[in-house]
Curated annotation (Swiss-Prot):
Membrane-crossing residue ranges in chain numbering: 12-32, 41-61, 85-105, 132-152, 160-180, 211-231, 242-262, 296-316, 341-361, 367-387, 418-438, 461-481
Known function: Catalyzes the exchange of L-arginine for agmatine. The arginine uptake by the bacterium in the macrophage may be a virulence factor against the host innate immune response.
Entry protein name: Arginine/agmatine antiporter
Keyword Cell inner membrane assigned: yes
Covalent S-S links between cysteines: none
Amino acid sequence: MISNGSKSGKNLGAIALAGMVISSMIGGGIFSLPQNMAASAGVGAIILAWILTGVGMFFIANTFKILSLVRPDLTTGIYMYSREGFGPYIGFTIGWGYWLCQIFGNVGYAVMTMDALNYFFPPYFQGGNTLPAILGGSILIWVFNFIVLKGIRQASFINIIGTVGKLVPLIVFIIITAFLFKLAIFKTDFWGDTVTKTQPLLGSMTSQLKSTMLVTLWAFIGIEGAVVMSARAKSPSAVGKATILGFTGCLTVYILLSILPFGSLFQHQLAGIANPSTAGVLDILVGKWGEILMNVGLLIAVLSSWLSWTMIVAEIPYSAAKNGTFPEIFAIENAHRSPKVSLYVTSALMQIAMLLVYFSTDAWNTMLSITGVMVLPAYFASAAFLVKFSKNKKYPNKGPIKAFTAKITGLLGAVYSIWLIYAGGLKYLLMAIILLALGIPFYIDAGKKGRNAKTFFAKKEVTEITIIAFLALLAIFLFSTEKIRL
């Protein structure tokens, strides 16, 4: 029997939700940002890349903010926006892809956590895929599972502490690099077009921008954190505030971390530092204590992000099951109103994926790249739904956001989402379609048993399922004949 709980469960305010957004966006990768950005670009190109990415992601962030205000009834937005705008099967497919993406993403956090521990306990956890690392990661999967089972509010409080814990080392890094900043060093080869014995030619501005934007476009995955948890928010306005606050805060930190080191070290020096490069930079600038601080920060960051995504990832199948597009069993809650079955199934799948890490690192890395692409259609569907709803007579034009503003925001958000999908790569997109097609049997099962059985399998749904199945078969053919290679 599905429990409705005795309380509403709406207990997450703007601060808790903003912590969710920041924690889900700022993971372990940020501690490698100085080297990642400097690897193939000068500081001028890096600044432009962040401006372009920031503008594009602003429209996606604002899409989520507007939708949370004009359609507060659509909680768990990523899934519900797609379902409301384009029907049950599209909603299911977006939710299914997002769920798979975050399952593998969480296992990625397990690998990064163990690899970060290797700094303190070498060589037992090297690479995050040794036997001790797999055992340690497996234990943490279930620790986080039981933390979230105790209640979303308690887990979000722990997450706020973790978010503060990982921001402190980053702020220290920013303060130190700002204090030691020298304009003369910063201006040296600003556009990356000077060749010296130590400084190779970095290429055209276009090539520099492309290489850096492949880094920046992934930096904002997680911006939807507050929207996904909106069913547990105190108010719709808290969701919008948290999304914009999280976006602005993260963008500021990203820019400062990427640019300030160029005032102390030259591009070729930054490009040659081993990751996590924030640790290497501080080791050069202030000594060993700086390196240790950054590695501690990395460990806290990964654990905090992992907890955030554990809360988020279980919410999608739980919400979809309540609407009849996932098997009904996923809607079962415990006494703390946590999505019990959804959490256990998600954690079990993560556990299986941990074994894949141990037996085949190459296969794991490929799977991580594929599932990373699967989150992007959710952004496009949300932006497209905003455009569609802005044309609807039910749009609240007397509210704070006019229909024209909503339409432009959605259009620009959709355009940027298409760019993200393109930048992700065709081969990974095709593999993602195969994984999306694997969800079809679950959708059919939900349609036969769910509360909305009468509305399932209309001509529109049959057509959509047929298209996805055809594209999946085409992708299998292209890979099997090596027309396209991973």
